[in-house]
Curated annotation (Swiss-Prot):
The gene is KPLCE. InterPro entries: KPLCE (IPR053348). GO terms for biological process: epidermis development. Coiled coil: none annotated. Skin-specific. Signal peptide: none annotated. It comes from the Eukaryota. Disulfide bonds: none annotated. This is Protein KPLCE.
Amino acid sequence: MCDQQKQPQFPPSCVKGSGLGAGQGSNGASVKCPVPCQTQTVCVTGPAPCPTQTYVKYQVPCQTQTYVKCPAPCQRTYVKYPTPCQTYVKCPAPCQTTYVKCPTPCQTYVKCPAPCQMTYIKSPAPCQTQTCYVQGASPCQSYYVQAPASGSTSQYCVTDPCSAPCSTSYCCLAPRTFGVSPLRRWIQRPQNCNTGSSGCCENSGSSGCCGSGGCGCSCGCGSSGCCCLGIIPMRSRGPACCDHEDDCCC
């Protein structure tokens, strides 16, 4: 639990409110300060060896910040507020530093807590998310940050459903067309993806295709392959198709 002496100490000009995230528990707090914003120290509770303090610094013209508790294995804090504000969040050792940067048009760079590796997310206008999933050790899962919806200023932490229990997959770039070799492919599937429960396919053949419901749609890759790109359907077997020796994930 947080020490009584380490509770948030807000400047006299700051007013504690009940903004986004504050209703999730006593670990959340919403603070609104007039320009120029001051640096706040917020006490959050987390299981060992997670720290109990998160230091949050935000810049002008930010006026409202919301402290949001993120998923296990570390209960840390993100700050949500409108662009073009930037956030610098530091978790003392052994947790790693997390940087969240949201300039227009919704581009994000995130470093996940140990033992997770980095996750890079780029959300070009109009805020379409492209995610690279990364390796994580148990009980950690790969994280990503979802781009804000239209008209929304919030961002939040969620886990990759294909990552549990902390398997490995790699970023897959779209292949070039007209017979040119792809830039990169999925080179390792997340665990248990051959069941199709996570939108992944293995040894699927002509009747198996990666879709939102798993393996089961027909996509014209021929008798020995499966379309597996998600956003660009292939009409013939090519770099986006899976064979019996391939594993792919949409």
